[in-house]
Structures are given as structure tokens and as C-alpha cells.
Amino acid sequence: MDATFKSTIPSCNLKKNYYNQSMKLNELPKTIPIFPLSNFIMFPGTTVPLNIFEPRYLQMVNDAMKKHRMIGMIQPKKTGVLKKPDLYEIGCIGKITSFNETEDGRILIILNGICRFKVNSEINSEKLYRECEVQYNYFSNDISKKSNEVNFSDLNIIMENMKKFFKKQGYIVNLKDLDKEDLSKTLNDLSMASPFSLEEKQILLECLDVNIRKEKMELILNNYIKDEFENKTLQ
């Protein structure tokens, strides 16, 4: 593993982390350092602590701190070479909001998800870490005020099914803190916190808008509930 992480999302309380409304799409860097961390997908508006210890990613964080303090989190595929696996096309850029160096040479950071990106191409570089040219046009709603309109009238079933699913998977999560947050932020929190497979989370990450993500999440949850019902019936 290149870093360890402990997301603040699947804990006893889902804490608020609002979007950075002061940032505009054209202010996001077009060339970004890429952190292909296995078994982890970050969503816009979520927060994750990272423990950085591998030399290439120590260099990456230090370089980012000298510039825009932003890092692109992306899921590596199972294809490609070990040191340079193929990447999914869609990831999420995050901003370092906390930075601490430890006595043993590690760096502890807090990364706040800002906006999803699509990889255009990878840059040949002499740096230890990977860099990519990216675009954000498909995901402008991630940082627009329009994406933060409160509308929970159609989330009741999802919330109830998610509670059942969390309990079935052995998670103890308090979803009450989500009641006053916007729809997109809530769906992103649930997507990141859920015990869904990485492939399912990647599907949710790639949904262009809130309604599509809501429909996909309903479908995923319904499939799990259906499988559980069929298993009980067979027994």
C-alpha cells in the first residue's frame, strides 16, 4: 500500500463537509498529480485523512503544497504493470486542508474532495509520481450552487434501505447528521461510506448528475436486498 487512510465517513457520525463554493471550474489545475490508491474512491464534498509514507507520494504531497495543494485521487485498474497500473478515466481532485510532518518522516494530510475529473492523457515526467492532463467540464455541478439545492422528498426509501444494508454488513452509522445537508452531498457521503464494491462505487462516481446517481444507488441497494431475500427463501 502507498498510503493508509481512515475515512471520516463510515464512522459513528457522518460529519458535515460543505463544498468549496468559492472555487470556480476554470481555477482548477489542468495538470495534476495522480494518486492511484487501491481500494479507495473519493467523492466531491467528502473528507479523508491520509497517512503518506512512500517516497514518490511524499514527493507528490510536498510538490502539491508548493503549488495549488491539490491531488487527484483515482482508482487503479487490475490491468497494466505493477508499478504503473492502468487507471479508470474518472477520478476526484481534492485539496489538502491540513498538513503535518511526523518525526519518522511520514506526512499526515486531510484531503477535501472538490470536483470529479476525466483523464485526457498521462504526462511523461521524471518525477517519482504520475501526472495527468485532465478536464472537469462534465462535472461542473460538483462545485456549482445549483448542485446544493435541498430536496429529500425522494430519499426516504434509499435512507431506510441503506440503514438496513449498513446493519447487515456490521456497520454502526448515525445518519441523522445527513438530514440538513444537500441532496448531492448526502448521496456522495452515502456512496463513499457504503460497503458497496469498488466497481459499484466507481459507477456511482461516474454518474453525471444527482438524479442518475440516486437511480443507480437505488438499483444497487435493491439488488442487495433482492439477493438477501432470495437467500432467506432458499433456506
Positions of PLM-derived features:
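Core structural elements
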Residues: 178-196
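Small/polar glycine-rich anion-binding or flexible loop at a beta-alpha turn
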Residues: 180-183, 206-210
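Amphipathic alpha-helical segments within well-ordered protein domains
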Residues: 191, 202-205
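N-terminal polybasic/positive-inside topogenic patches
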Residues: 6-8, 13
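Positively charged
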Residues: 12, 18-173, 199, 203, ...
